[in-house]
């Protein structure tokens, strides 16, 4: 069976071969508990700390400012819930944006039910947050701003450094969900200036079920999971050594080849976009033209339904929809709604995302399949 061309790298990524090899000993022989003081615990303990250093080198931060989690969702929950909880006496106001991942928006909704108020910032037609809107939303009760670094649907990269600068002037902490940006663009913490940053392993060719949370100097995250005191007493539970090793190796690879990989993904993305624009009328590329992830293209096909397009191309191309079309209504993603994309365009939005393994031959075959499907649906 020939597998479809994979163009959903923002959804998840395949395991890099080097990641699989790095993890192999911890599947086959190195089963020890890293908390054990005997011989069997020594190598797993060393492997966890090596991985912590590898993640830190990609982000440009000391290893001691990182804890391992089960992924981006847990990191976001931890960053918002425990920090907000620890600062409750100082303030109860959180600022976020309308295009955040549910792993941030749903946490903020949870906090609203526990004594906090939340301001949701709008975005422009390109999906950008205006830092002046963030500044205007700050009150004397604001304790945390959580804005994603790059959007998972349209790829728009937010002005996080500028938002962090204005927040710092007011003594407000800033968290960024960097699940989509880590490994694709520069995420050096000295440039971003944030206090907390979330990482998701499965977006960077590491396994699902592992991630990391950075917390900056002076930031004291509360205990998220009580128990035997692993991860500096912040997140108890025996470490998932196998997947932590995989995350570390993935970060090492990303750090070594960041520019090269970004250039390749951008070339493949641009080949797809230019091909679609040449072959088809009435299409629109969503997101910022320049401030956009190098691998991400969100394409709206006028007066078509995304799920119909995906059904047509499914044997050849794997991608994802920006709108779910049901028999009686169209459910447009909250991101496209926030960008105020007209329904005639939004309902036909498909996200294609390239990766390190995408080839020009795959893009050309995908172009043929997508173009043929759209033409057939428009007859």
State what each model feature region is:
Residues 1-379:
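Pyridoxal 5′-phosphate
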């Amino acid at each position: 069976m020939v597998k479809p061309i994979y163009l959903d790298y923002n959804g998840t990524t395949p395991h890099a071969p080097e990641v699989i090899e790095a993890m192999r000993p911890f599947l086959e022989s190195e089963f020890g508990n890293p908390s054990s003081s005997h011989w069997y615990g020594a190598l797993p303990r060393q492997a966890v700390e090596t991985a912590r250093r590898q993640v830190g080198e990609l982000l440009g931060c000391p290893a001691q400012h990182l804890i391992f989690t089960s992924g981006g969702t847990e990191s976001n929950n931890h960053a918002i819930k425990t920090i907000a909880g620890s600062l409750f006496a100082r303030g109860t106001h959180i600022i976020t944006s309308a295009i955040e991942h549910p792993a941030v928006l749903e946490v903020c909704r949870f906090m609203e039910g526990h004594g906090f108020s939340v301001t949701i910032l709008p975005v422009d037609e390109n999906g950008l947050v205006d830092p002046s809107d963030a500044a205007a939303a700050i009150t004397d009760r604001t304790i945390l701003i959580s804005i994603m670094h790059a959007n998972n649907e349209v790829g728009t990269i937010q002005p996080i450094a500028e938002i962090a600068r204005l927040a710092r002037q007011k003594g407000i902490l800033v968290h960024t969900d960097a699940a989509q940006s880590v490994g694709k663009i520069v995420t050096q913490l000295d440039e971003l200036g944030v206090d907390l940053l979330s990482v998701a392993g499965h977006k960077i060719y590491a396994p699902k079920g592992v991630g990391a949370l950075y917390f900056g100097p002076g930031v004291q995250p509360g205990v998220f999971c009580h128990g035997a005191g692993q991860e500096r007493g912040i997140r108890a539970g025996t470490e998932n050594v196998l997947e932590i090793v995989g995350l570390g190796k993935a970060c090492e690879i990303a750090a070594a080849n960041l520019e090269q990989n970004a250039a390749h993904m951008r070339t493949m993305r641009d080949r797809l976009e230019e091909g679609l624009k040449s072959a088809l009328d009435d299409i629109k590329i969503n997101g910022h033209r320049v401030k956009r992830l190098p691998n991400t293209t969100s394409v709206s096909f006028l007066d078509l339904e995304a799920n119909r397009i995906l059904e047509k191309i499914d044997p050849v191309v794997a991608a994802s929809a920006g709108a779910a079309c049901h028999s009686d209504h169209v459910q447009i993603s909250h991101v496209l709604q926030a960008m105020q994309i007209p329904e005639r365009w939004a309902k036909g939005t498909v996200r294609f995302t390239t990766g390190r393994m995408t080839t020009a031959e795959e893009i050309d075959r995908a172009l043929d399949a997508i173009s043929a499907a759209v033409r057939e649906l428009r007859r």
